[in-house]
């Protein structure tokens, strides 16, 4: 984190005489996703990476998440996608769209670097249970074809959508799978308008719409 940026919440809190919570953990908003009913999902690739909180065990990190977010149940998948400089933010791989339902990205090309990583995540999701012992309903979302910038693979993913009150803003990539991804998401969010917006010139910054919202 940038030290001067990190001071801003404390200054605002002091100015308005409101409490400020210091969680004591290094993490980013894109590393967690919620079902709105007490369950959080994250990835070991990100939150257990030694470049963040090497002094904390998995159980200690879970306790921080429970205390900070007020959740009761935490689910872990292992992998992120290739090209993600955050080590594996969950907002590129797995997203809740209902209390018991997730969208997970899948790579169908067996030669692609993401194939085995995302297949592993899918297997883990299939074995997970919610607190009431229900299995997750899993909807598979395709990955776009690889996108490169200066020979660097970019973390292009349709899962990096942003949910607003009335809309779901979905990154598209001038790719043959764009419409398929939009159609899947329309089925997942029937009460919202699903809008695809070209993210090709945004993704070179290593994130898309959900990343921008965080």
Give the ranges of each region predicted by the language model:
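The feature marks the mature, well-folded catalytic cores of soluble enzymes
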Residues: 1-214
């Amino acid at each position: 984190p940038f030290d001067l940026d990190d001071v801003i919440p404390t200054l605002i809190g002091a100015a308005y005489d409101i409490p400020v919570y210091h969680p004591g953990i290094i993490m980013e908003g894109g590393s967690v996703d919620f079902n709105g009913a007490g369950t959080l999902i994250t990835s070991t690739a990100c939150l257990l990476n030694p470049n963040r909180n090497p002094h904390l065990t998995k159980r200690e990190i879970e306790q921080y998440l429970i205390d900070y977010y007020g959740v009761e149940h935490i689910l872990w998948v292992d992998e992120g996608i290739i090209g993600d400089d955050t080590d594996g933010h969950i907002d590129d791989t797995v997203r809740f769209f209902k209390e018991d339902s997730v969208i997970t990205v899948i790579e169908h090309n067996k030669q692609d670097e993401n194939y085995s990583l995302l297949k592993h995540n899918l297997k883990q999701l299939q074995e997970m249970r919610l607190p009431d012992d229900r299995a997750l309903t899993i909807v598979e979302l395709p990955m776009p074809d690889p996108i490169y910038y200066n020979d660097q693979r970019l973390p292009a993913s349709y899962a990096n959508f942003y949910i607003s009150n009335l809309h779901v803003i979905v990154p598209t990539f001038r790719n043959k799978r764009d419409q398929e991804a939009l159609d899947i998401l329309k089925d997942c969010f029937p009460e919202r308008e699903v809008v695809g917006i070209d993210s090709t010139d945004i993704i070179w910054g290593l994130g898309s719409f959900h990343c921008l919202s965080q």
